[in-house]
């Protein structure tokens, strides 16, 4: 199942080496992927992510965080980047409204990346899902206030959603097999030799990079392939 890759202690993993973590960064719940589920999570199994790994995260944080230790100062460049995004969207004065772009995104995902998928529909979806993203170049946010600005909130949410939609569409297109909730009519069987792996995706605007990381098939703390 999808999510931020973590180890069994809820620490976020990187690609640089076996089980190498990002210091100080943790993820739990449905935002995380600990590799304990199959390709289609069973009902109520989200409790594992919340209760089991929530407890594991708390225990690990208690081990790592020393009382009185100050937070590292956030670089000014990172703060400026967040503020630039906020101000750019709040002051957008184009012709496309967020609701129309969001509806276009929803229709594309429902028609091209639904339950049953094919090479043709996914390839069409890969192209179509980028149109709502490109529409943000001429976006309009009419409410410029800083108090209870639902127009801005919906726009910030859409900015996140459209990137996730692009990532999902591209990942589905490149996975040429059927597994769990991912059903390809043109590839009806699993391909364990090639795709017994989690999909990794980097999204930079409308461009994505796809890679893979092996699933954990044994009881932790069995590491992933050390050659990654």
Predicted segments — roles?
Residues 5-27, 31-220:
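Glycine- and aromatic-enriched mobile tails/lids
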Residues 218-228:
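Single conserved hydrophobic/aromatic residue that forms the stacking wall/gate
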